[in-house]
């Protein structure tokens, strides 16, 4: 099996190094390729560089640094860098979970979406991190990711245009739960600074609510808080079909 690894934390991030080690040691793939951004691109979502030249630096036989966004990195990795199309795309391991409404900002999800657009099984992988306990502990993905990947690849009804979004909790995992995305909404802190030039600089900080104060129901956020690994299927087609049917029914006689 040929696997493409990508991420949004950047080529030099620990998470993608851990992911590479897991895939090599597990024997899941015979070929492991990496195409990842030159620097941290968290929050870049699905932005892609078009009509601009993108520099790509080859580091090893199958490892490439892309001077662009996560989606551009995956796009070039899939269509140019790897040659023959990979059998699997793994995006991560992200430092911090990707759940709730924050998913729309996620470069980890955005990079995985490039694989899903080509009907390649694509998995986004994230590790919870609260910034309060020093180094990130990767023990959960190191213990369980191989099993999860093999399990998902055996799913007979997996529509390959669906991204599998996997999140690992901060604490030792109690098990796995299949969950919905949820409605997790962080608060924002905006720092404002006036520059000598006369311009104003704004720095946005996303602040996660304390556990127990997130306003969730039985979704991926609650499962993570309860110590479970979560797996959430995400569709590329964002159509609200209930609303679509209602609009068609409401305006069935609409004319212009």
UniProtKB/Swiss-Prot annotation:
Keyword field contains Hydrolase: yes
Alphabetized UniProt keyword annotations: Cytoplasm, Hydrolase, Metal-binding, Nucleotide-binding
Disulfide bridges in this chain: none
Cellular compartments per GO CC: cytoplasm
Cofactor binding description: Binds 1 divalent metal cation per subunit.
Catalytic activities: a ribonucleoside 5'-phosphate + H2O = a ribonucleoside + phosphate
Chief localization: cytoplasm
Locations listed in the record: Cytoplasm
EC number: 3.1.3.5
Family statement drawn from the similarity comment of this UniProt entry: Belongs to the SurE nucleotidase family.
Name the UniProt record assigns to this protein: 5'-nucleotidase SurE
